[in-house]
Amino acid sequence: MRFLKIIVVILFLSSCSTEEDEIILKLDEYDLEVISYFKEIALGFEFGSSSKITRKWCSDLKVYIGGESNSILNEELDKIITEISSLTTDNFNIEVVSDSSLSNYYIFFGSGDDYAELFPNSASYVQSNWGLFSLWYNSSNCLNRGHMYVDTYRTNITQAKHLLREEFTQSLGLARDSDKYLNSIFQSSWTETLSYTDLDKDLIRLLYHPKMSTGLD
């Protein structure tokens, strides 16, 4: 019931101009923390001029893994996908496909230069970023394609695993960073976090709850 309550409040606040203290539903401190962090992380993107509204995948996410073969990172991706799938309740599905033509999301393991050859629009970012993601969305604010990379030359395996989790999770539509919580996967400063905090999990649950729609601010 907690998440349904939070969803109702978010929907209320997004469509109502009255004062927040008129809300009848009582929220505890953690509920308010989740809502505040959700608004900070889920509205808009870190770069560009896109409006600060909710966006998420409205169809299945079909992942193709390219670049250099890396069994350790492949296994880590499987683990991350399993974790995400356990948190979503709106029929969102993630699968890894072996044919890039069937995919709508490309994960590249290798060097930044090789990634930039495949995706030239990312060329200006790879020198200063060991991990990177890009997303596109349609007129309904549903994410519909994207790509990311993990630089396996400038990172050790722990760092590479962290970047894979961070960039892939942000590609769900939780696309902004924050300096608020040190252990969060969305922490803006460099960390080597390899797991989600309870708060991180709740953000995924909220965005991929059946009551959460795109286009909310």
Model-derived features with residue positions:
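Metalloprotease/metallohydrolase-associated module, dominated by Zn2+-dependent proteases
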Residues: 20-32, 47-48, 124-159, 175-217
